[in-house]
Amino acid sequence: MSDYKNTLNLPETGFPMRGDLAKREPDMLKRWYEQDLYGIIRTAKKGKKTFILHDGPPYANGNIHIGHSVNKILKDIIVKAKGMSGYDSPYIPGWDCHGLPIELKVEQLIGKPGEKVSAAEFRAACRKYAAEQVEGQKKDFIRLGVLGDWDHPYLTMDFKTEANIIRALSKIIDNAHLHKGAKPVHWCTDCGSSLAEAEVEYYDKTSPSIDVRFNAVDVATVSAKFGAANANGPISLVIWTTTPWTLPANRAISLNAEYNYQLVQVEGECLILAEDLVESVMKRAGIAEWTVLGSCKGSDLELLRFNHPFMGFDVPAILGDHVTLDAGTGAVHTAPGHGPDDFVIGQKYGLEVANPVGPNGCYLAGTYPTLDGLFVFKANDVIVELLREKGALLKVEKLVHSYPCCWRHKTPIIFRATPQWFISMDQKGLRKQSLEEIKGVQWIPDWGQARIETMVANRPDWCISRQRTWGVPMSLFVHKETEALHPRSTELMEEVAKRVEQDGIQAWWDLDPAEILGADAADYVKVPDTLDVWFDSGSTHSSVVDARPEFGGHSPDMYLEGSDQHRGWFMSSLMIATAMKGKAPYRQVLTHGFTVDGQGRKMSKSIGNTISPQDVMNKLGGDILRLWVASTDYTGEIAVSDEILKRSADSYRRIRNTARFLLANLNGFDPALHQVKPEEMVVVDRWAVGRAQAAQAEIMEAYENYDFHLVVQRLMQFCSVEMGSFYLDIIKDRQYTAKGDSVARRSCQTALFHIAEALVRWMAPIMSFTADEIWNEMPGERPQYVFTEEWYDGLFGLAGDESMNDTFWAELLKVRGEVNKVLEQARSDKRIGGSLEAAVTLFATPELAARLNSLQDELRFVLLTSAAKVADYADAGDDALQSELISGLKITFNKADGEKCPRCWHYTQDIGLVAEHAELCGRCVTNVAGDGEERKYA
C-alpha cells in the first residue's frame, strides 16, 4: 500500500495550540518596550483625527487590585479600538500622589512632621514613598498589556503639574468663585482634617435616639397661639435627635411652616408636636393618655422663644423646608455649626455659627463644666444624663442607623464649622452652569446623567482647603487684620507657581513673603492650608491635558472610571472646568460597576473571596483577564471567580483554535502571488468572507458603542458557529486533498487569508498579546504591529441577487444541521462510524429540491458525506425522518457504496480505475497526477 501522505496539503504553523500566556506574554512585553511599540503607534497615527481618553489617576498607595485591572483594561480596549477606527489616541497614564493616606504611611515610617522630622523632610519622604508606589503599580499595569507612555506618566506631584494646579485655583479666584467662611464640613477627628464628600462612606452605627423638651419662655403667648386657655403645667417644644453631643451648639428649633402642630396635654405638662407624629411620639414615650388642646400652623410659632435645656439661654423657633415628617417630632434641633441644613437656615435667621468642638473631636474649654475636654461621642451618655437631671429628657432609646464615616479610618465623622476656603456653587452661578454643561455630555450608561445632576443640584459649596502637610499649597496671602485676600492674588500666585515649577511645593514653605510682597509683607500672612486632593485630580484636564504637547491642544473626549466617581473625579473635574473655563472637561463619561465574587458579594479579605490580578496573570495570562473584562457587561456589578475565569479561558481556547486553523492552512500561501479574484472564487469561500464582513460591521458598531461583551459574543459566534461548526469543517477535504496550487485550494486560502486579516484586528483591542502573536505568523508583507492598523477593508460578500446568496447558505446550514442529527443518531446506534460512511437522500419539495440540486455533485461536500442525492418529497418512505426545522424536508441514509479511499477517506466505486494509483479514487488521482479537480460551489 502506497503512502500518499506527502501528496496532502497538511496544515502547518509555528503558532502553538497552547497559549502558554503566563510564560510568553512577559517576553512580548519586553519586545514591545525594546522596540518602542507605543512610539511606533504614535508615529503611524500622526495627523489622524484625535481621541483623548484622559486617565483618572489611581492613588499611589498599595498594590493594584482586580478593580484597578478592570478599569485599566477597559481604557486600553477603547484606546486600541479607536486606533483601529482611524484615530490618533495618545494615552498618558497618571497617578494621584498627594494626600492623607501617603502621610499616614510615612508617619508610620518616620513619625509625624514637627516631632521627629521637619515638615520639609516629611514632604521629601512622602514624595519618595509615592514615587516607589507608582513604580510598583506601573509594573502591574504594564503586565496587563496596557499600552501607554509609561516612561512619561503624569504625576500630580510633578513640579510642573503642582504649579499648574496653583494656576487652576488662580483662574477660579479670578472668576470670583472662591470664598472663605466658617461652615460645617465633614471632619474626621482621626485625620484632624476636613473631608471631601467623596471621602465619606456610610456604615451602620448605634446612637442614642432622644426626645428632648425645650420649655417655652412665655407660656401664655404660646398657649394663645393654640387657642388653649386651659393648659396645665409647663409647655415644651419637643425635638428629636440622634446626636446629643451637638446640643451645646443648639441655637434654634426648626419647624415646617406648612405643617399642623398640636398642643397636647399629658400628665402635669403640655407638649408641642407635629399633628401627624403625635401618636408615634406618645407610643415611643410610653404615654397612654393625652388630650389635644389646640392646633396651629408652624408659621404661627415663628420666633417664639424656648429655653435651652442646660446651656442657660433661650433659642427661637424658626421655619425651614428641611423639616419632614419621616421621623421624630416635627421639630428639628438646629446647630448651625454642626450641619449643612442647620447652617443654611441659620444664615437666613442670622444665627451664631457655634462650634465648641476642637480638631481632635473634644469639647473646647468653657463649653460646659462636665463636657470640657470630653470626646464628643463619649459625651453622648453624659448629655443624656444631664438632660435627665434637668427634667428635659422625654425618652431615650438606641437606634441603629447609617452614619457617615471616614473612608480611611472607617470611624464616625462629625460636622464641624471651621474657617475654610470654599468654591461657591451659587455666588457666580457655578451650580446652574454645571447643570447646563451636564446636558451636553454623553453619559454611559445614560442613568449617570440623572445621578450627577441630582448630586450637583443638592451639593453644598466645595470645601477645598485642608490642614495637611503633604499637598499642593493654596498659595494665598491674607490680610492680618481683615483676613481679606491680597488684591494682587492671581499675580502673586503666578509668582509662586513659577517657583513651584522649579523646586516643587516645598518652594512655598521656603518662601519669605517679602520676596514677592515687598512692603505688603508687614500686613499679609501666608495661608498654611493645602488643597483637597480632589482638586489635584479634578484639575488635570488643565494641569496635564492642556499642558502636554502630545495632546495637541485638544480637550479630553472621555473620562472612564468606577460608578463611585460621579461624586468623586467626575464631579471635581466638572466643578473646576466649569469654574475655570465655563465648560465641562469631557464629552463622554463612561462608568463601570464594582467587582464582586461569583455569588455577588463584595470583595473582602475577611471573607477570603478576593482575586489578585497578579495571580491570574501568573497562572492564566493577561489575555484571559482581558477577555474576562471584555466579556462582562461592565455597566452593572462585575462578577469574578475561579469558575468565571475558567469559562473565559475556555472561550479563549476556542478563539485561539480558530486562529490556529486559519494560520495552519495558510501554509505556503503568498498573498502577493496566490490570491484568487473574488469572482473566480468557490462560492462558499466568498460566502465565508461575506460572513466575516457582516461580523466586522457588527463588531465595529459594538466597539463604537463600547459594548465589548457584544464584541466577544459576536466573535465567539463567528468562530464557533459560522466558522468552526460549518465552514472550517467542510473545507478540510478541499484544503487537504486538492492539488496544492489549484484554484480550488487557493480560493479557500484566499478566504482564510481575508478572514484572518479581519479576525486578528477584531481581537487586537481585547486579546492584545494573542493578536500580536497571530500577526507575526500571518503570511505576506505587513507592518511590524497590528496595533498600527485599521479595520480590514479587504472583505467582500456575495451579491444579494445571486441565486447562491446569504439566504441560500443560511438555509443550507439548517439542512446540514438536520442531516447531522440523523447521522449523530446513527453513530450513537453504531450503524456508522464517521459521516463519510454515509450516503444521504434528501426528500424535498420542488423549490427546496431545486436549490439543493444547484450544488450538483458538491452537495456531499457540504454535508460531509460520501454521497448525497435529492429526491421528490412525495417519494419519501416511512423510514424517512421528517425535519423539525424545515417542513418540506425528509432525510434517509444508507451506508455508502464502494470502498474507502485511503487518501480522502471518501467511499466511492471508482477506486482502482487507474493502474498507477490503484488504491485511489478517481478524484484523488486527478488531484495527485492530473490537473486537479474543479470546484464551483463548495
UniProtKB/Swiss-Prot annotation:
Self-association and partners: Monomer.
Its top-level enzyme class, in one word, is ligase
In this chain, Zn(2+) is annotated as bound at 901, 904, 921, 924
Where is it located? Cytoplasm
Corresponding gene? ileS
List positions binding ATP: 605
Disulfide-bonded cysteine pairs: these are none
Q: What is this protein called?
A: Isoleucine--tRNA ligase
Give the protein's biological function. Catalyzes the attachment of isoleucine to tRNA(Ile). As IleRS can inadvertently accommodate and process structurally similar amino acids such as valine, to avoid such errors it has two additional distinct tRNA(Ile)-dependent editing activities. One activity is designated as 'pretransfer' editing and involves the hydrolysis of activated Val-AMP. The other activity is designated 'posttransfer' editing and involves deacylation of mischarged Val-tRNA(Ile).
Q: Where is this motif: 'KMSKS' region?
A: 602-606
Q: Cellular component per GO?
A: cytosol
